[in-house]
């Protein structure tokens, strides 16, 4: 008994061989647990990376949309090839084609061929009807908007019915149709029906329309889940009533848009209009968000593929007028998804049109950029503005636009002198 106590009661008094033996035993146990855990991950990989199947060579980081590959630029060409695959002709139902003989069937886009038979009840719940049809009637329309003048740029602005103050602020600022001398701009607010079924609000919208003639409205419910319908309404309106428009911008009612910079630095009226042109803040390498609690949740039965094609943030993108008809027509053969910007990207992938990057990555911003007249004189979009803020900063920019960066340089020099003195 005394011998056992001398050998085992205290680790500090153990011999070197005993310590080494005990350490080896513990190490083997830990390595065994690590091996078992690794095998568990191997056989249950889908449970640890939602929305992604199989092993991934690239690390992933979580974003607001879902998972994004940190090496997506490297894999962009291969991803584009995946989205350009087609299925054998014998598997396709009768399909429609546009004037360019582009196949408009969803089977032409990898990832959508299996979604046509998915349950469409989610669309009925959102008041949209069949997920592939477009049958909404105009409540308010402006069919002669482009007959009175030949605009260079149409601003399609997604707005909620109750955002009267936001529409008023936009008319006074970046949506002013007389903003650019010698350049015709047309402003159109895109509205659905208020979910509150407010008769007073609808009468106010009708009066607003009679006064400004810049609202189109159709009979779908105006909700976040119907933003895709709202954008398609705008595309169809442009294709129907302004088919020869050089450029279109789709943006939102809470955005700051430097319209002059957009026209003069990006679109350049002195040059011939581009075709099949689409640009904005490029979103590359994004995978569907499979978190059911997320605003951007994408059910696997609606979109089974592992990754979205390249798309532009819906907060603001610009495209050539010829794409309005092409995007709308191709959408008739592609199952509708509630993520509007992703859906437009899918339509572009089906058309074999790649969004192009803007002149620099700082001109389109889907977040709020801290204000300075210098920064805002060299960007196109900034996000999350209240109507009063929009008017305040717009007026300040207009007052300082000819020397927007001069004050910034003076302030920087002053700070440098202050640091040098202290």
UniProtKB/Swiss-Prot annotation:
Residues listed as glycosylation sites in the UniProt record: 75, 100, 119, 176, 226
Cofactor: Mn(2+)
GO molecular function list: N-acetyl-beta-D-glucosaminide beta-(1,3)-galactosyltransferase activity
Ranges annotated as spanning the membrane: 25-45
Statement: the UniProt record of this protein carries the keyword Transmembrane helix: yes
EC number: 2.4.1.86
Tissues where the protein occurs: Detected in heart and brain.
Record-level GO cellular component terms: Golgi membrane
Gene3D superfamilies per UniProt: 3.90.550.50
Cytoplasmic side: 1-24
Keyword vocabulary terms for this entry: Glycoprotein, Glycosyltransferase, Golgi apparatus, Lipid metabolism, Manganese, Membrane, Signal-anchor, Transferase, Transmembrane, Transmembrane helix
InterPro entries (UniProt xref): B3GT2_N, Glyco_trans_31
Protein name: Beta-1,3-galactosyltransferase 2
Protein source organism: Homo sapiens (Human)
Designated gene of the protein: B3GALT2
